[in-house]
Design a protein with these regions (language model features):
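N-terminal accessory regions of S-adenosyl-L-methionine
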Residues: 1-116, 129-130, 224-225, 230-304
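Conserved class I S-adenosyl-L-methionine
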Residues: 117-126
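Class I SAM-dependent methyltransferase SAM/SAH-binding core
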Residues: 127-170
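Short conserved loop adjoining the S-adenosyl-L-methionine
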Residues: 169-184
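A conserved beta-strand element that flanks and buttresses the S-adenosyl-L-methionine
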Residues: 191
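A short His-aromatic
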Residues: 194-198
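A short glycine-rich, Lys/Arg-flanked "PGG" loop and its adjoining helix->strand segment in the class I
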Residues: 204-216
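Short glycine-centered segments of the SAM/dcSAM-binding site in methyltransferase folds
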Residues: 217-221
């Protein structure tokens, strides 16, 4: 009850539409019947706001308004010469939340026996907050990140292997070269959370992720922001358009965006759907708002040979 009372006045801002709301309006449900694909309708698993999610929402408030404002000013200065990702890494900001430990347990349970253990790969892991939640279930973890600052943050967290790289083309070989005893056949579970709208070629990314998975048994956890509004963040802080365009709407309902991502991107590459869920993609707040949020679709997939 105490946590519920504490969060009653939270101010959360949607980073897409600028709407302001409290935690009770965070998106977890969906109009499942409106999904065009029967596979999507049948595999939808509803998650919900829980105590771990609420704890994350309160972090900015716990840090204090003055400290949040100081960090925001410093971030603005740094962004004159570098990307937001790199500035956040230097300042210890930019923590993200996609799902709680209980959420992960629900999704892994749907995958059946053998979904835990073995080796886990998190591609584009950021500062490692979500990586750590997932990594608890595995014997070994490799985290990749293209930002030097974020890669340093990952090393501080003590993951088994950290690769500073913007590609996963040779990730199994590189992990083994650094002492990781991942199978030559690939990783047991791979996560790519909110990368498809930030890379030059999302199809190439998914093909590489599929090759990094163990055939038959490997699981891919893929989170994509909906509506889909892609851009590439360059090292100097500028933005450019991806090389590859997808026929996916940049506005409209979550359901229409998910349908388009499934038919345009995911299904044609041969993935089988295990579960689909809707979760808020939460970013740590600042002196203006307690948190910022985007709308995520989480696809749990298998890649048959």
């Amino acid at each position: 009850m105490a946590s519920e009372e504490r969060t009653s006045a939270l101010r959360i801002r949607c980073a897409h539409c600028d709407a302001v709301f409290d935690e009770r309006a965070l998106p977890y449900d969906a109009d499942v019947d409106s999904l065009a694909s029967s596979a999507l309708r049948e595999k939808f698993v509803r998650l919900s706001l829980d105590s771990e999610s609420v704890e994350f929402l309160n972090r900015a408030r716990a840090r204090g308004r003055d400290e949040c404002e100081r960090l925001a000013r410093k971030c603005t200065e740094l962004r004159r010469t570098m990307s937001l990702t790199e500035a956040n890494a230097i300042l210890g900001r930019g923590k993200m939340f996609v799902f709680s430990d209980a959420h992960v347990e629900t999704l892994m349970r749907a995958c059946g026996e053998g979904a835990g253990g073995g080796w886990f790969l998190d591609v584009g892991a950021g500062e490692g907050e979500v990586t750590r939640t997932l990594a608890r279930r595995f014997a070994g973890t490799c985290a990749t990140e293209s930002s030097p600052g974020m890669a340093s943050r990952l090393r501080e967290k003590g993951f088994d292997v950290v690769l500073e790289s913007d590609t996963v083309e040779n990730v199994v070989r590189e992990t083994r070269a650094r002492g990781g005893d991942v199978s030559e056949d690939g990783f047991d579970v791979v996560a790519a959370l909110n990368l498809c709208d930030r890379v030059r070629s999302p199809r190439a990314l998914l093909r590489d992720l599929k090759r990094a998975l163990k055939a038959k048994t490997g699981i891919l956890i893929l989170a994509i922001v909906v509506p889909f509004r892609p851009f590439v963040e360059n090292a100097d802080g500028t933005r450019s358009q991806p090389d590859e365009r997808l026929d996916v709407p940049s506005a409209g309902s979550w359901e229409s965006g998910v349908d388009a991502l499934w038919t345009e991107l995911i299904a044609p590459l041969g993935f089988d759907l295990v579960t689909l869920s809707r979760v808020p993609y939460i970013s740590e707040g600042d002196h203006l708002y307690d948190a910022y949020v985007l709308d995520d679709a989480v696809f749990v997939l298998r890649a048959p040979p």
